């Protein structure tokens, strides 16, 4: 068996998706603790303690206690090498999150057991559906009062349209939380509070009918036996093939803050989640065990190091292997580049990567030549597909306090748009600059970064824009005519793509009726 195959088989690359405040950052911490990447979980954001979560590292994130940028962490667990892509959890950070989901092979969905399925979870699940990504589910916060577990699973099935197969089952909740029963292993793992910061041995009782169980948890043991009869009759059994197709999700219960149940999830991911999968390109399917190196960029991050105004392009390796100093072909610009200083990540701690395999994420230093969606190969000319831009949902006009810095403003905005922090539009008929985002917080981030990184003071003004669509037409003549007649609604985005800026949805619908040959697209392939 080749080295490459051994390494590929070891890899598991996944992201965590959840609604804000469902406990995603805490889970990330605890997962790293189990992977020995952290000695003591930095319980997230004790405001006074100065102990910040390892994966939240940009200044603004430290101030607010939210993860604004996707960071990447690699750690060994159970004979596998796990790559965890942390996704922005806050209300407003979704476009980056959407794109991160294109770089993983499976996802862990975290649900607050007191609340059930929430909006953001629904949106993110829609994105995972584009590629039928396998989903593992963790019902979190069992140390609080929760909704009925069967009701929670029914809601996941109804709202997210995915079958649930419970792997562990909770015994009590809130102050009466006693532990979980592991259905496949037929064992009860007992919960003790106050063990959230370190990994300690848990008491395990083998067998649901073991008299030891009655001694340990009293009448809860009989309740559990009755409940399991019901659960076995009413729920799905775990089916590995259905899981790999994205049709069924294994469900685990626990509390991330109490560091309980996290090892069960990791065991499940290592045992069941797919190793690095083949990827589609515009030429053919690229298999992970091919000899030649290929990869694509799914995110660009500015200033991971405040001392240097650098940018790092995050690349998912798809086939072959990266070796320090190798030559890569940058397909979009048709140039070969020597890469000797790619990085691996442990959230903000960068190390030079000597070698990387399919499923791994590496960082390339970028001085403005790399864009989101770029493909790198060892000479072959094709493009990986499926890394989209999403039409913004909110818009502002942006202008300078000091009009002499227009050039820096445009440069800053174009760079931030290439990175995916925001989208920028330049109307054909005016000198305005319009910024589009998927959520309000992105606007704040952009003004903050323009000031700290480009020394530009910018302010926003309201603008009557409802939505944007990328426009295409196979017939050049018809496109030119459309451009002439609708120029007051047209703009170029950061990559000079023609975009229709609609003041209202009614206006958009009328234009779509009036120009049936023009395609108005909600997403755009990079």
Curated annotation (Swiss-Prot):
Superkingdom per UniProt: Bacteria
A Pfam cross-reference name: RF3_C
GO MF annotation: an example: translation release factor activity, codon specific
InterPro entries named among the record's database cross-references: EF-G-like_DII (IPR053905), EFG_III/V (IPR035647), G_TR_CS (IPR031157), P-loop_NTPase (IPR027417), PrfC (IPR004548), RF3_C (IPR032090), RF3_dom_3_sf (IPR038467), RF3_GTP-bd (IPR041732)
Record-listed GTP binding positions: 18-25, 86-90, 140-143
Main location, first listed in the record: cytoplasm
Residue stretches making up the tr-type G domain: 9-277
Residues passing through the membrane, by range: none
The entry's keywords: Cytoplasm, GTP-binding, Nucleotide-binding, Protein biosynthesis
One of the protein's GO biological processes: regulation of translational termination
GO CC entries: cytosol
Subcellular localization: Cytoplasm
The family this protein is said to belong to: Belongs to the TRAFAC class translation factor GTPase superfamily. Classic translation factor GTPase family. PrfC subfamily.
Function: Increases the formation of ribosomal termination complexes and stimulates activities of RF-1 and RF-2. It binds guanine nucleotides and has strong preference for UGA stop codons. It may interact directly with the ribosome. The stimulation of RF-1 and RF-2 is significantly reduced by GTP and GDP, but not by GMP.
Name the record gives this protein: Peptide chain release factor 3
